[in-house]
């Protein structure tokens, strides 16, 4: 069965993000283009953000009637903070799947912190990635596992099988596999519990945003 327009609207931004991530990992620091691979994150803001803007009207889960209540938003923030707290402690060697695809150390050649790079990285992680990933992993993949006509699936009825399988695939896309299981299951649980993708997006954004601040404060660049 061919994928619907709604499916492609959720797949394309994610595919563009993964393509740029692979390019950043494959491009050596010294390359013929004279391009610093770390600045590919700026392309993410433009390319992936542009794709999300292009398809935005097709994302019904972000309509006004699907916004979370104050209580639901508070729950999402709490979940995001809990995931952050667990994520930074789930980094033992056995909790890793190989090495990160592309290391990100925002330091200049003379050892100074490169704040423009940090700003670009943080904005992408806290604003673009949560929307793009939740649209793909939860809105599309989790519901598609429940039924190929995923647009008709109420997230509250997606079921345990869809949660587990989508979280497993989510894990495969991350180096810290155990942390990814915790995060993926938490965001999926929020989506199923509230029926609102905004809650998963808020939690994801809180996790990524606070993680970025912590990374800069602690100098633990390996978490980026």
Task: Map each language-model feature to its residues.
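Juxtamembrane loop-transmembrane helix junctions in multi-pass integral membrane proteins
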Residues: 1-4, 32-35, 111-115, 195
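Alpha-helical transmembrane segments in multi-pass membrane proteins
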Residues: 5-59, 66-80
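Structural signal for membrane-spanning alpha-helices in multi-pass inner-membrane proteins
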Residues: 21-25, 48-56, 83, 87-91, ...
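Transmembrane helix-loop junctions in multipass membrane proteins, especially transporters and channels
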Residues: 29-30, 57-61, 92-100, 174-175, ...
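Juxtamembrane helix-loop-helix connectors linking adjacent transmembrane helices
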Residues: 35, 61-132, 142-157
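Alpha-helical transmembrane segments and their membrane-interface exit regions
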Residues: 47-54, 105-106, 185-197
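Transmembrane helix-loop-helix hairpins at the membrane interface
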Residues: 86, 113-224
């Amino acid at each position: 069965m061919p994928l619907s327009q709604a499916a492609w609207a959720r797949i394309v931004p994610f595919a563009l993000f993964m393509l740029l991530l692979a390019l950043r990992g494959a491009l050596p620091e010294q390359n013929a283009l004279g391009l610093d691979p770390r600045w590919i994150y700026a392309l993410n803001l433009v390319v992936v953000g542009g794709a999300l803007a292009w398809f935005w009207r097709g994302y019904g889960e972000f309509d006004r009637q699907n916004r979370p209540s104050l209580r639901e938003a508070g729950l999402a923030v709490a979940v995001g903070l809990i995931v952050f707290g667990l994520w930074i402690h789930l980094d033992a060697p056995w909790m890793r799947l190989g090495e990160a695809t592309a290391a990100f150390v925002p330091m200049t050649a003379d050892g100074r912190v490169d704040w423009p790079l940090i700003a670009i990285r943080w904005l992408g992680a806290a604003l673009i990635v949560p929307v793009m990933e939740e649209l793909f992993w939860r809105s599309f993949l989790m519901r598609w596992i429940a039924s190929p006509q995923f647009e008709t699936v109420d997230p509250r009825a997606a079921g345990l099988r869809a949660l587990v399988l989508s979280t497993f695939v989510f894990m495969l896309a991350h180096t810290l596999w155990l942390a990814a299981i915790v995060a993926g299951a938490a965001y999926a649980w929020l989506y199923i519990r509230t029926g609102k993708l905004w809650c998963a997006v808020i939690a994801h954004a809180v996790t990524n945003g606070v993680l970025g601040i912590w990374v800069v404060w602690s100098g633990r660049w390996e978490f980026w």
